[in-house]
A protein has these predicted regions:
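Macrodomain-like recognition of ADP-ribose-binding/processing modules
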Residues: 1-141
């Protein structure tokens, strides 16, 4: 696993990269980077089409196209826990390994409106993906 942090627009990465970001189980996608995913990929509609009414039971990863939606909380106004984020990352890892995906790009997940600490989140990413050969690019602006 290789994790790099780059000052870059997430949506300008090479198409070989699958994207990942955090969402709530109510699929609100009304603010922050989640809103940009909804605008660019009609993500809210796609999530409802594929998963319907989703009930939060812990961290989970819902894949739509080349986007991994990390469900880390029930409602959009709540804050996630590191436990839920870890569960979502572990679920994403299983899917990435199964699908033989080698390149992931994401924002500073959980650290914008969700207010998690990047140092702890980076540590989780490194632990979860340690035994893979996935290239993770973290984009920030």
């Amino acid at each position: 696993m290789r994790l790099t942090e780059v000052e870059k627009d997430l949506f300008s990465v090479d198409p070989q990269y699958s994207l990942a970001h955090c969402i709530s189980a109510d699929f609100a996608l009304g603010a922050g980077i989640a809103k940009q995913f909804d605008t660019r990929f009609n993500m809210r509609y796609e999530l409802f089409e594929k998963y319907g009414s989703y009930h939060f039971t812990g961290g989970k990863c819902l894949k739509i196209g080349s986007v991994f939606n990390l469900v880390t909380k029930d409602k959009c106004w709540q804050k996630p826990t590191y436990k839920a984020l870890r569960e979502a990352l572990e679920d994403m890892k299983k899917q990435v390994v199964t699908l033989k995906i080698k390149h992931l790009a994401m924002p500073l997940i959980g650290c914008g409106l969700d207010k998690l600490e990047w140092d702890r989140v980076r540590e989780l990413l490194e632990k979860v993906f340690a035994d893979t050969d996935v290239d993770i690019m973290v984009c920030y602006r």
